[in-house]
Amino acid sequence: MLTLYSDKKAHNCQGYSRRELLKIGALSLGGLGSPQLFAQEGQGYIRDKTVVMLNMQGGPSQYETFDPKMDAPSEIRSVFGEVKTNLPGVRFGGHFKRLAKMADKMAVVRSYRHGISDHAKAAMHVAAGGNPTGACMGSLFSRVAGITNSLNGMPANTLIVPAAVEPDDARKFNSVPTRIANTGKLSSVYGAFDPSSGGDVLDDMKLQVPHDRIMDQLSLTSSLDTLKRKLDSSSAIHQASALQQQAVDVLMNGVGEAFNLSKENPKLIERYDTSQFDVPKAAVDRRKNKDAIRGHSPISLGKQMLLARRLCEAGCGFITVSSPGWDMHGAHEFAITDGMPVLGPAVDKAVSAFIEDIESRGLTEKVLLVITGEFGRTPKINSKGGRDHWGNLCPLVFVGGGLKMGQVIGESDKKGAEPITNPITSNDLLGTIMHSLFDLGKVRTLANLPRDVQDVVGSGSPITELI
C-alpha cells in the first residue's frame, strides 16, 4: 500500500530512525487538518477489540445457512439438507461442515428481524445497526475513535471488497460498497478506507522523498500535494485531505505491510483459499446477464478473510468484508442450486480458517466476527428455483470477542419465517457491537464528542445472552 523510499541505509524497517519518524509525524502539514483524525490516548474509552463484519450481500437464506428446518415441507426446508454440529440438537445447512464442528465457538441468532425487504434500504439499515444517522457502524466507530489509530497509523475503519485482493480479475464483482459502508449524516471523512480504490491510486500512494531531504518540510509537503492532486482526480476517493493525512500516518508507521498477503505462509494461504469455488460455466451460459452471474463468484473470499485477519493484528478497529452473490431469485438470475454449491463451501472454508487462525494467535477474545446480510429469504421456494427477499428473519452469527459462545439465541417458527422467541432487533446488534468496541460510560464523558453522537453510539442494548 504505502511505502516511503529511501536512498540511504535503513535505521529500521521503514528506513528511518524512530526520532526522524516522530519528527516527520510532528510536522505541520498545511491543509491536512480534519476533525477527530486521531484516537485520543489515555482515556481508556476504546476497548482493545476489533470487529470484523462479514456481509453476505444480496441476502443469504436462513434455511441454507444456519436454520435448515428439515422438518418443514420440501418447498420450505433447506435444499441441501443439514449437517449436525458439535452442539446437541443444533443443525446447520448442508454446506457448512467445517463450521458445524466449530459451533461451540459460535453464537447463532435465529430470531433477528427488521422487516425491510428492499436491498438498499435493508443493507444500509443492517450496516448501521438501525441508528438514525444512517451511518454504518464502522463510520460510527471512526467518528468516536478517530479515522486513524494514533498508536500505529492504521485506518480505524476498512472495507474489503473482492477487488481489494483480486485487482487483476476482469470480472465485475457484484459488491455494492455504498450499501454497507455509508456515512449517513456523518462527514464522508469517516467513510471506510478502501484498498481497492482502483486505477493507479495505490501506486500513487507511494511518496518518493530522498533521505537527505526527508526533514525538509517543504519537500515533504510538495510530495503530499502531488499525491493530493492525484487523489482528487480520481472519482474513487473523496475527501482527499483527510485521506492524505491518513496516508501519512500509514506511511510513517509502515502499515502498508499489513495489506500485503504475500507476507503470509503459503500453507496458511492455502487453508483460506476459495479459488476453487467459481461459478460453474453451465450456470453462466444459461443466464442472460452472464457478467452479473460471474460477479457472484466467491473466489476472493478466502483472501479477503485473510486480509481481515492481518488488519486485526495490525490494529484496525472495524473491518467490513463484502461477500456478494447471495441474491438467489432463480431463473435468469442466480438459483439456489447455482449459488449455494459455491457460496456455501467458500464461506465454510474461509470463515473456519479465520476462526482457527485467530485462535492460534491468541486473538479470540480480541476479535469479534459478525456474520449477516441485509435480510433472509422467503419460506417458500419460488417457481424459478429461488427464494425472494424476506426481512422478517435474517441470519446473524457472532464469533469470539469475549462474548458467550456455544449457543443458539432465539427460535424461529416451524416455517422459518418469523421469530417466536426472543426477537432480536438491529438496535440490539448496534448495542452489542458498540459495547464490544467502547466503554460507553467513558464515551459519555468525552467533551469533544457531540452529545447526539454519544446518544447514537450508546443507544443500543447488547444482546443479553452474549454478555
Describe each PLM feature range.
Residues 1-467:
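Ligand-binding pockets and gating/stacking loops
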